[in-house]
Design a protein with these regions (language model features):
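C-terminal active-site subregion of NodB/CE4 polysaccharide deacetylases
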Residues: 1-74, 81, 116-119, 218, ...
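Metal-dependent polysaccharide deacetylase catalytic core of the NodB/CE4 family, i.e.
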Residues: 16-22, 31, 93-270, 303
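Short, glycine/acidic-enriched loop or turn micro-motifs at the edges of active sites
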Residues: 79-80, 229
Length: 314
């Protein structure tokens, strides 16, 4: 599948996927949008496809009448920068969007993946410097695991995402396929401590507050599930753990919204048939992936998305 803005004309119903924003107190990071850049990217998208508000897109999906060029705007990971920077742009364009929120940080369990991303951006000159330090720490702390991974790394790993460098793909291979969550956390804690900060300090700055989530819903945006703890690979969990990820996520959001969410996006785009079954049992009606790959017999829980990295900003 071609990854480009032009592909929206004929790729089938698609979500535009956004994560990070800078401005209004939030520092610039890799891939982040300013308010102006975000507005221009939506303008570009609306010229080549039919940009719908989330509630309209959702209704058309449920009625099975989405058009080939229908697109919508979506946000993952429940980040405060999305509320502080992007929400006002959406208001100015009279557009509402999907906001998919993982709720672990609200239960005292910080979203480690995003905290580590912010740490990399703020404490390292560039990601390659971080990758080098990560490799060095892993090789020193867990040498057998490191050497084994070097032998088994598939060169085509994640090449479906052309904006990933080889360093990106190697790091994600270590993180998502080789290390256990506890092993990855151990390595990252060592590196963070070496730089004089903590997970808790970073978490305070990035997590979208319950009040902001409630305000988004009041403004007409559609808030949905994104799992509770945002596992890097949710398919590695047991059946009970998979169900818990979404049921707990739903409990938190239902408390904020006074109604149960009916939509979701798959964390890291990862899911399996068991997860789809869990979502159907929870009456989740619409779900989004994180890529543009074709899926045979695609259900409404597997709608494709175009990463914001492919959207022009000028």
């Amino acid at each position: 599948m071609t990854h480009s803005l032009a592909s929206l004309k004929s790729s089938g119903p698609t979500g535009l996927m956004f994560h990070h924003f800078h401005g209004n107190g939030h520092l610039k990071s890799e891939g982040s949008f300013s308010a102006d850049e975000f507005g221009r990217s939506l303008d570009h998208a609306s010229r080549v496809a039919n940009l719908l508000s989330a509630d309209v897109f959702l209704e058309k999906a449920l009625n099975q009448n989405l058009d080939e060029a229908d697109i919508c705007c979506s946000f993952d990971d429940g980040l405060q920068c999305q509320f502080d920077v992007a929400a006002s742009v959406l208001t100015s364009k009279k557009l509402n969007a999907f906001f998919f929120v993982n709720t672990g940080p609200h239960a005292g369990h910080p979203y480690i993946l995003e905290i580590f991303r912010i740490f990399r951006n703020q404490f390292f000159e560039n990601k390659d410097v971080f990758f080098t330090e990560f490799d060095s720490c892993l090789e020193t702390t867990m040498p057998e695991i490191f050497l084994s991974a070097k032998k088994t790394f598939p060169e085509d790993y994640l090449t479906v995402y052309p904006f990933y460098t080889r360093g990106d793909r190697w790091f994600r291979y270590l993180r998502d396929e080789i290390l256990t969550p506890d092993e990855y956390l151990e390595i990252m804690k060592l590196i963070i401590q070496d730089h004089g900060t903590s997970i808790g300090e970073i978490n305070k700055k990035i997590t979208m507050s319950p009040e902001s989530i409630t305000q988004l819903a009041a403004q007409g945006h559609v808030v949905g599930l994104h799992s509770h703890s945002h596992p890097t690979n949710i398919t590695r969990l047991t059946a009970t753990e998979k169900h818990s990820e979404y049921s707990v996520n739903s409990e938190y959001l239902t408390g904020y919204l006074n109604s149960a969410p009916k939509c979701m996006s798959h964390p890291n785009g990862v899911y399996d048939e068991e997860i789809l079954r869990v979502l159907r049992e929870m009456n989740i009606l619409v779900g989004f992936r994180d890529n543009m790959d074709s899926v045979s017999d695609r259900s409404n829980l597997e709608i494709r998305r175009l990463d914001s990295a492919f959207l022009p900003r000028d």
